[in-house]
Design a protein with these regions (language model features):
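Glycine-rich flexible loops
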Residues: 12-152
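Single conserved hydrophobic/aromatic residue that forms the stacking wall/gate
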Residues: 1-6, 10-11
Length: 152
């Protein structure tokens, strides 16, 4: 994975139930269609290459890993793209869990529509472009005005 990924981010998220799967139940989740791998094994801290190699194998070329008892790992070609995916993925999980708490069935988007939506979002460099704009806007918010906490 070294050389293929410019950035990796991890979040300890609310979707740590056993067997949790990101479902294609709303528009934001569709951007992750066929991009999520699941690892039901937690071996503690990743302190050696063996466990790191195992996680890379589990990911199988996908950009997102739901790692049991750990959290979500997102990889991307840039910090902006990894952050953008993490931002929207966290919101997808929140919406899905809120919908699941209603006790009603989720309304799953068919695979062909989910695939087309994902392709449309990525066309013409769209995903990278919007991720950069999103990340730049976040940085501006942190660098301007009183109480700024971020400097480039």
């Amino acid at each position: 994975i070294t050389g293929l990924v410019g950035s990796e981010m991890c979040i300890r998220d609310r979707c740590c139930t056993k067997g949790f799967r990101l479902r294609m139940c709303h528009q934001n989740s569709l951007r992750f269609f066929d991009e999520v791998a699941y690892d039901p094994v937690f071996n503690g801290l990743v302190l050696d290459d063996k466990e790191g190699d195992r996680l890379v194998e589990v990911m199988g070329g996908k950009s997102v890993l739901f790692h049991a008892n750990h959290g979500i790992i997102v990889c991307g070609p840039s910090v902006a793209e990894a952050f953008d995916d993490m931002y929207y993925l966290e919101r997808c999980c929140k919406v899905q869990i809120l919908a699941m708490s209603s006790g009603e069935d989720l309304n799953i988007v068919p695979d062909d529509i989910a695939k087309k939506f994902k392709e449309d979002c990525a066309s013409d460099g769209g995903k990278a472009h919007w991720a950069k704009l999103h990340f730049d806007a976040l940085k501006r918010g942190l660098t301007r005005g009183p109480g700024r906490i971020f400097r480039e």
